[in-house]
Amino acid sequence: MTRPLRLHPDRLFPADAGTRDIARRLYGSVKDLPIISPHGHTDPEWFAGDAPFPDATNLFLAPDHYLYRMLYSQGVPLDRLGVPSKAGPSPADPREAWRMLASNMHLFRGTPSSMWLNHVFGEVFGFEIELSAETADLYFDRIGEALQSPAFRPRALFERFNIELLATTESPTDDLRHHKAMRASGWKGRVVTAYRPDPVIDAEHEDFRASLSRFGELTGQDVESWSGYLQAHRMRRAAFMEMGATSTDHGHPTAATADLSLADAEALFRKLLSADFSPADAELFRAQMLTEMARMSLDDGLVMQIHPGSFRNHNAGLFARYGRDKGADIPTRTDYVRALKPLLDRFGNERGLSVIVFTLDESSYARELAPLAGHYPVLKLGPAWWFHDSPEGMRRFREQTTETAGFYNTVGFNDDTRAFLSIPARHDVARRIDAGFLARLVAEHRLSEDDAHETAVDLAYNLPKRAYKLDEPARTPAAA
C-alpha cells in the first residue's frame, strides 16, 4: 500500500503553540534567503560540463555515504548499491540498486537522511507518495525522465536552488581544470574551490609519496627540501585563490598543533621522506603543518578550517576494496585546549587570521570550544558537523555554545555534502532549527523578537559570508 508523502509546514518547530508561532515568523524572514554553501564536497565537473545526471542511483545513492553506510550496517553489500570500488565502476544495475534503497527506506526513520530525501522528492521532483518497494520503479522512471530535461541540469538546479555561492574542496595536486572551465564558459554561477592539503601533509596517507611527486610537478619546486615544499604550498594556494578560494580545510586525526624551530622542522621533514618514521612523527608533522598553514594564511588571507577527530577508514577490509569515504569513519574524543595551544601561543591574538574549528566530539562544546572561541580573536566555531548535522545535533550545538561564545563567534551553517540535491533541504533544516531556538529565547523573554529576526538572518546568510570573507577583495600574497 502506498503512503502519501507529507512535508508538514511546521516540521521541526517547537511543540508549544505560542513558541511555534514565533518560530514561524522567524523562519518566514529567512526561508527564501539565498544559500551560502562555503564548505562542501560536490564535484566541480558537474557544473563545468553541465551534463545531465544519469539516473536516480547515481544522483542520490552512489555519492552519499550517509545512505549506503546505513544499508551496509544491515548487511547490504556496497557492490549492490552502485558504489564504485578501487577496481572500477560498480557492476550493479542502477535500477536494482534503487530498488534496494526503496525497499529499505524504513531504516532511515528518524534520521536526517529521511528528512533530506523527502524534501528533495517532494519539493524538487513533485512526488506525492513515499518511496517504497512498491513505488521504486515509478520513482526511478520519473526521476530519470526529469533528469533529461534542461531544467534538471546541474547549472539550472544551482540557479533554481537560489545558491549564491558554493565551495568545492580539492587537493593541492588537482589541476583545477573544472574550475577553469567554469570560468571560461561565462556561466554566472559562483562556484569556488578550497585548499585541502591533507594528501601532501599526512605521511600516513596511502598516496602520500605519489601526491608529493605530483605536487612537485605542478609547482616546479623541489618538494623534498623544506623550503621548496613550503614554497609549493604557497604557489598552489595562490592558484586556488585565482579560482575563487577563500579558505583552506584540514581533516587531521586530531587538533594537535606544534611550533618547531626551523632546524627541527627540517629534520622532521627529512625523516618523513626517508619512510623511517613513527606514527608519532607523522602526528607531529601534521601538527607543525597546521601552524605553517596559519602562517601562510596571515600572508594570503585564506580562512583556515580544522575538521579533526575522525578515525578514518575504521573498516580495514572495506578500505582495501573500496578506498576512502565509504561510510566507515568513526568519531573520536578530541582535545582542543592543549592541542591548539602552540598555534594560539604564536598566532592567537592576530586580527588578520581566522581559524574555524569543528568537532565530532560534542563533549567539547561547552568545556573547550565555546570558551576558546569566546576568548581568542582568531577562533570561530564551525556548525554541528557530519554525525551531528541533525536536528538534535544542531540544537545541542546552540544550547552548549551560545551562553559562552554567543552567536557571533559562530559561522552560520555548512552543508558539507557530496549530495548536491540535498543542499536546499539541509539549509532549510538549519534555518528551522535556529528559528525554533531563537523562538524559545523570545518566549522566555531573554531576547526581543526584533533581535531574534536580525540574528536569524545573520545565522542564515550574513555570518557565513563574513566568516569566509566572501565579500572581500582577493588579497595578493606576500612574496616568499
From Swiss-Prot:
Enzyme class, first EC level, given as a word: isomerase
One Pfam family per UniProt: UxaC
Reactions accelerated catalytically: D-glucuronate = D-fructuronate; aldehydo-D-galacturonate = keto-D-tagaturonate
GO biological process, one term: D-galacturonate catabolic process
Pathway assignment: Carbohydrate metabolism; pentose and glucuronate interconversion
GO MF, one example: glucuronate isomerase activity
EC annotation from Swiss-Prot or TrEMBL: 5.3.1.12
Keyword Protein transport: no
Entries under Gene3D superfamilies matching the protein: Metal-dependent hydrolases, uronate isomerase, domain 2, chain A
Keyword line: Isomerase
Cross-referenced PANTHER family: URONATE ISOMERASE
Entry's family note: Belongs to the metallo-dependent hydrolases superfamily. Uronate isomerase family.
Name listed for the protein in its UniProt record: Uronate isomerase
Organism encoding this protein: Phenylobacterium zucineum (strain HLK1)
Phylogenetic classification of the source organism: Bacteria, Pseudomonadati, Pseudomonadota, Alphaproteobacteria, Caulobacterales
